[in-house]
Swiss-Prot record:
Organism encoding this protein: Xanthomonas euvesicatoria pv. vesicatoria (strain 85-10) (Xanthomonas campestris pv. vesicatoria)
Origin: domain of life: Bacteria
Function: Has an important function as a repair enzyme for proteins that have been inactivated by oxidation. Catalyzes the reversible oxidation-reduction of methionine sulfoxide in proteins to methionine.
Coiled coil start-end: none
Lineage: Bacteria, Pseudomonadati, Pseudomonadota, Gammaproteobacteria, Lysobacterales
Catalysis: reaction(s): L-methionyl-[protein] + [thioredoxin]-disulfide + H2O = L-methionyl-(S)-S-oxide-[protein] + [thioredoxin]-dithiol; [thioredoxin]-disulfide + L-methionine + H2O = L-methionine (S)-S-oxide + [thioredoxin]-dithiol
Name listed for the protein in its UniProt record: Peptide methionine sulfoxide reductase MsrA
Length: 216
């Protein structure tokens, strides 16, 4: 039998992933910071999922961006439906810790969100982010439109040039379209750093400026 450590640096193969559950985890559907719903149809608004390490600090990066309507943390990109935090931390779900960002495209451009994403973490670290090691900390952009996907790929290529010039390696960010199912995390994790202002935040960027979204 494989131990949990076996899944820290590799994704579970078919048959290795935990089964999960049919029912979604309970969710208090109100954003603690802005009062908007966490779950809904969000008609007239755009959505994207970002993974950039521990989702506590990642979510705060985006709820502070003007034009973002709401944010929520959850699990995405893996195989286990409605996984729990402990299951995701085992590495046996294939999920990354993700932030759902719902935004008004008339108030904030996707390019600006991409710039926040790239500059808020080190996208060259593979299955970890800083001291947080495991597949659930991998960098990811899960797009909901073809236009987002094309823009994400172009931004990756532009940022790679800047990172290479600064001595960094290859970007390992997973970029996908269409976006996989987003499974909302437990209530305790939603807007965690608003509930615990001095709580853990392991995010750290490279210090390399991303050359997109400056004039958007």
């Amino acid at each position: 039998m494989l131990g949990i450590g076996a899944f820290k640096q590799r994704m579970p193969r078919p048959g290795e992933a935990l089964p999960g559950r049919e029912q979604a985890l309970p969710l208090h559907n109100t954003h603690l910071v802005n009062g908007h719903p966490l779950r809904g149809e969000f008609i007239g608004l755009a959505q994207v999922q970002f993974g950039l390490g521990c989702f506590w600090g990642a979510e705060r990066k985006f709820w502070n961006v003007p034009g973002v309507y709401t944010t929520a943390v959850g699990y995405a990109g893996g195989q286990t439906p409605n996984a729990t935090y402990s299951e995701v931390c085992s590495g046996q779900t294939g999920h990354t810790e993700a932030v759902l960002v719902v935004f008004d495209e008339q108030a904030v451009s996707f390019a600006q969100l991409l710039r926040t994403f790239w500059e808020s973490h080190d996208p060259t670290q593979g299955m970890q982010q800083g001291n947080d090691v495991g597949t659930q900390y991998r960098s990811a952009i899960y797009c909901t439109t073809q236009a987002q996907y094309d823009a994400a790929l172009a931004s990756r290529d532009a940022y790679q040039q800047q990172l290479t010039a600064a001595g960094y390696g290859a970007i390992t960010t997973e970029i996908r379209f269409p976006a996989p199912t987003f499974y909302y995390a437990e209530d305790d994790h939603q807007q965690y750093l608003a509930k615990h202002p001095n709580g853990y935040c392991g995010l750290g960027g490279t210090g390399v400026s991303c050359p997109i979204g400056l004039d958007a």
